C-alpha cells in the first residue's frame, strides 16, 4: 500500500518524482483551491500526448504519464481555464477536445475570455451556472464562439446554462452550421456591439435541422438599426439553404433589430417574448431561390408576446406562408407587412394602431388552400 502524496499545483506535479509515489493529489491547477486540482496516478508505460488536464507529462522522466482519476464529468478548471485569468481559449479547447468521444463539460461561475472560435465535438454537453457562467467572445469577424468541430455529417451536442457575450462586430455566439438533433437550454446571449447574431445558422449543404431551443434569450446593444439578430436563420453561405424543422420554446429577445430572420421551412416558434425590436419575424426566401422553380416556405408562430416591435411580422416574398397566433401585442406600428395575405393565417387580439394597441377584436389573414393539378 502506498501513501497518497499531496502537492499544491499542476506545475508541482510535473516536478514530482514518480519513484517517490505513484499516487498524487494536487490542491489546485495554478494555485491551491482554484478548482483545477484532483487525484492522479502514475502510468509508467503511457506515452499518450499531454492534454493539459487528464494526461500530464512528467519533467522527471520522458516515459510514463500522470493520469487524472476522473469522476466522469469534466471541469474546465481541470485544464487551467480559470475565471478572470486572461485569455483561456487554449485551455477551453483542450477541455472540449477531451470530449471527442462524448462527455459532459462543466463551466462554473466566472468571467472567461475567449479570443478564437471553440470547436465542440459530437456527443458533448457543455453546461454552466446560467447567467453567472460568462463567456466573453472577442474572436475575429465572421466567426462564432461555439462551433461544431465536424460539419459533415452533421453532429449532435448540447449546451445549457451559459451566458455568452459577443464583443466583435459581424460575429456570432452560436454558429449552428453542421449541428442537428442538438439541444440548447437556458442560454443567455448578450450582443455588445452592432451587426452581431446570437444563434446563427446558414446552410451550404450543412443546414441546422431538428434542433430544440428552450428558454434561449438574446439581448442587443439598443439604438436604431443596430444590425443585430437573435435567431439569424438565413442562407448566407450559398444563398440556397437555411435551417429547417427546428423548434424554439420560450425565451426573451430585446433591444436588437430583428428577433427572427428565417429563410427555412417547418420551423416552430412557440411562446417567445419580444421587446423593442424593429422586426419580430422576418420570413423570406433564400436569394438564389427567387428565380427557382421551387418556391415557398412555411413556418408557425404560436403564443407570441411582444412590446414595441415596430413590425411584428414581415413577409418579404409572397410564397413565405405563415400561421401565427399572438397572445399579447402592444406598442407596434404594423402587425403584418407582406407581399400577399393568401395562404397565411394570423390571429391576434390587438389592432395595429399606436399608441397602446389595446383594442380587442378578431383578426385573420385570408387563407386559400393550395390547388394541386
Protein language model features and the residues they cover:
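Glycine-rich, low-complexity segments
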Residues: 1-10, 63-77, 346, 351-373
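Right-handed parallel beta-helix
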Residues: 123, 127-132, 153-166, 180-191, ...
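Acidic Gly/Asp/Thr-rich repetitive segments characteristic of extracellular carbohydrate-active
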Residues: 1-21, 76-108
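Right-handed parallel beta-helix/beta-spiral solenoid domain characteristic of secreted/periplasmic
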Residues: 70-90, 125-172
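N-terminal extracellular ligand-recognition/capping segment immediately after the signal peptide
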Residues: 4-11, 28-41, 101-125, 129-141, ...
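Short, surface-exposed terminal/edge motifs of secreted or surface/virion proteins that either
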Residues: 22-73
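Flexible, charged surface loops at secondary-structure boundaries
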Residues: 13-21, 96-101, 120, 151-153, ...
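Hydrophobic "rung" positions of tandem beta-strand repeat architectures
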Residues: 174, 198-199, 231, 260, ...
